[in-house]
């Protein structure tokens, strides 16, 4: 039996729709995409697979002779994207400076709140725990944007027959409806690249995007947050991020 699982934010509903609408074995109509909403309105038939979500014991399923497929990411970029989409789609907003519930802890400063979120992000994307890397067939969600052929190949691995023209169209719609999230991570990655190269230019970042940049820098330089100078205000230039490294 084929079992399917996914990390929150990893386009699980989208991938189930892909299986059921872009293969010869599937018989569902092509789904309608809603901008920035993924396909949470899509109700899978679960005939071609058994869904295990939010928990899936991959090793136990494999011990029973089942094959386990998942939507996830093996790249740091993809994992930042998954976390961003998971937060945005489940709570309707992403953590902000002085959030009264999540990140405002006993009156901590902007920089201290930023570090809490940054370290949390770094620890999460750096660990392989909960990303289902031990699954038999892993779909990397970044391929929806960059490599539809890999999406078709993944369907083929499942023992299904992909309809390539439909897969390509599906990937265009899936990526377009989530482009805002992809662009946010790409913007942060570009800024971090420029900080590393010491290129000076203005930046406009949300609190969460600033935390992403901060955690990317921690990851790149393999340092702890205590090794960086505390930010006292939102950075408006790459120079402000360059300065905290010195």
Where are these regions (language model features)?
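PAPS-dependent sulfotransferases, especially Golgi type II membrane carbohydrate sulfotransferases
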Residues: 158-246
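Compositionally biased, intrinsically disordered/low-complexity regions enriched for serine, proline
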Residues: 41, 92, 97, 231-232
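A structural signal for well-ordered alpha-helical scaffolds and beta->alpha junctions
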Residues: 12, 147-151, 238
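Selective for proline/serine-rich intrinsically disordered segments
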Residues: 29, 52, 98, 232-233
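PAPS-dependent sulfotransferase catalytic domain
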Residues: 46-193
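PAPS-dependent sulfotransferase catalytic core
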Residues: 1-56
